[in-house]
Amino acid sequence: RDFKAANNCDRIVVLWAASTEIYVPLSDEHQSLAALEKAMKENNTEVISPSMCYAYAAIAEDAPFVMGAPNLCVDTPAMWEFSKQKNVPISGKDFKSGQTLMKTVLAPMFKTRMLGVNGWFSTNVLGNREVKCLMIRTTSRQKKSASCL
């Protein structure tokens, strides 16, 4: 709200581009907006992730929300209900913006050009936290449940 006002924006879109969160399984608290709001008021961090709080706040402010990580976040009946109620779009499960994207694009090209690949080595030269986050068992579980690792 403050950003929108300070920058004289007519509209904003909230885009989540943080690292993969700790795995949060779909639970009763995600089945309806009332249950989600109750869990949020009770600060139930077992079922409410930080990204869910950001998504909820964005929707409440009529700002579309795009989930760029493989987190549960907006992929719940409660968020769908809130989005529909406010007529605010939500989308996304994973940008596939790093190594996965490169491999998804390059591998078919190599095959089409009949280029054999004996191995694949990649380095994260930018040093983001994804590998460190994936070393955490609960985060790795979240990523694996939402993608093709």
Regions found by a protein language model. Name each.
Residues 1-69, 73-86, 99-106:
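Metallocofactor- and cofactor-centric catalytic cores in central/energy metabolism, strongly enriched
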Residues 91-93, 97-149:
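Conserved anion/nucleotide-ligand pocket segment
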